[in-house]
Design a protein with these regions (language model features):
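Short, flexible, solvent-exposed loop/turn segments with mixed acidic/basic and small polar residues
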Residues: 8-9, 76-82
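Core-facing hydrophobic residues within beta-strands of well-ordered domains
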Residues: 12-15, 86
């Protein structure tokens, strides 16, 4: 059953990025840069999602540190309920349509 499903949806090529929600992006950057030796590629404001995102490449993948900028955004609610930590993992696949994960 699992093998048939995997054949149908295609192959997961790689982990594209891991989104980690943080309270304070500047403090989190210190940890990821100093303790883990990662380099900051860029910081991006995303008003449409009410977040600031720091991008830290790690080989073929990337860590995204995500800080909410309003208290009523989806990310802020996630942070209030669950605290800092992994918010999402983005996978690169052969054919996104076949995964059944595309929302219209």
């Amino acid at each position: 059953m699992v093998q048939a499903y995997i054949k149908e949806i295609g192959v997961i090529k790689k982990i594209d990025h891991i989104g980690i929600v943080v309270n304070d992006i500047e403090e989190a950057l210190k940890v990821y840069q100093q303790a883990l030796g990662l380099s900051l590629a860029k910081i991006q404001e995303r008003p449409d999602q009410a977040v600031t995102i720091a991008f830290l490449p790690t080989g073929e993948s990337e860590i995204e540190l995500v800080q909410p900028v309003t208290s009523d955004s989806g990310v802020a609610k996630f942070l209030q309920k669950r605290g800092e930590g992994i918010h999402h993992i983005c996978l690169e696949v052969d054919d996104i349509e076949k995964t059944g994960m595309v929302q219209e």
